[in-house]
UniProtKB/Swiss-Prot annotation:
Biased composition (Basic residues): 235-248
Listed name of the protein: Small ribosomal subunit protein uS3
Key word Oxidoreductase present: no
Residue span, KH type-2 domain: 39-108
Coiled-coil features, chain-numbered ranges: none
Gene, per the UniProt record: rpsC
Pfam families in alphabetical order: KH_2, Ribosomal_S3_C
GO CC entries: cytosolic small ribosomal subunit
GO biological process, one term: translation
Length: 248
């Protein structure tokens, strides 16, 4: 179950919130849902260089609030705010009614943001990097940035092989069934000459206890507690020939 379900949907309402927050009747619901999808596609297309991790949409009456979480907020805002003004004008054309407000939130640590890690791997593969090297480097970068665990899954015609397969790189601990685990999940597509590769990334940063994420310290052994090479068998003495003879 934990391997198949979307980690964000599995923890929705527990450690994860909704990306679209609004209420609508049965007749308006489908139309507003399509508008949200168009807004997200527009943001991803126009601001692909800004490192967009998440687009949240809030609706209250005739007000539409779009919150963009980006690794490079300066690209979203633009020089003198020109880019964000143009983006707001484009979004207003997609919205049926109401005024639009666009807010930008900076991601403090992009290296542990799963959507951004997946996008970085996809860009490297599209530039003909070795896929194993890209996966391992991304996992190491995530662990060095303070994450407790990371899992990267790459599927498709890896290396141009005739038969599609899947490869996984895992570092640290990534709990799949612990609902209080703070797991960030992101996907991306790498379009290559031999087909499309799918990338999934899960980043575990700690457990949410009392409304805040608490990191779990890794168990460490002291120097005097470390076992010698060979385990307990190295400390066992073999009986000498004289002792064996005396025992007989």
């Amino acid at each position: 179950m934990g391997n198949k379900i979307n980690p964000n949907g599995f923890r929705l309402g527990i450690t994860r919130g909704w990306n679209s927050r609004w209420y609508a009747g049965k007749k308006q619901y489908a139309g507003l849902l399509k508008e949200d999808e168009k807004i997200r596609k527009l943001v991803d297309k126009k601001l692909s260089a800004a490192g967009i991790a998440r687009v949240e949409i809030e609706r209250a009456g005739q007000q539409v609030n779009v919150i963009i979480s980006a690794a490079k907020p300066g690209i979203v805002i633009g020089k003198g705010g020109d880019s964000i003004k143009q983006l707001r004008a484009d979004i207003e054309k997609l919205v049926s009614a109401g005024t639009v407000a666009v807010n930008v939130a900076e991601i403090p640590n992009p290296n542990i943001s799963a959507p951004l890690v997946a996008l970085r791997i996809a860009e490297q593969i599209e530039r003909r990097f070795a896929f194993r090297r890209a996966m391992k480097q991304a996992a190491q970068r995530v662990m060095e940035s303070g994450a407790r665990g990371v899992k990267v899954v790459l599927s498709g015609r890896l290396g141009g092989a005739e038969q599609a397969r899947r490869e996984t790189v895992r570092e640290g601990r990534v709990p799949l069934h612990t609902l209080r685990a703070d797991i960030d999940y992101g996907t991306a597509l790498a379009r290559t000459t031999y087909g499309i590769l799918g990338i999934k990334v899960m980043v575990f940063t700690g457990e949410v206890i009392g409304g805040r994420t608490e990191t779990i310290a890794r168990p460490q052994r002291r120097n005097d507690e470390r076992r010698p090479e060979g385990g307990d068998r190295a400390n066992r003495r073999r009986p000498t020939a004289r002792r064996r003879a005396g025992g007989e």
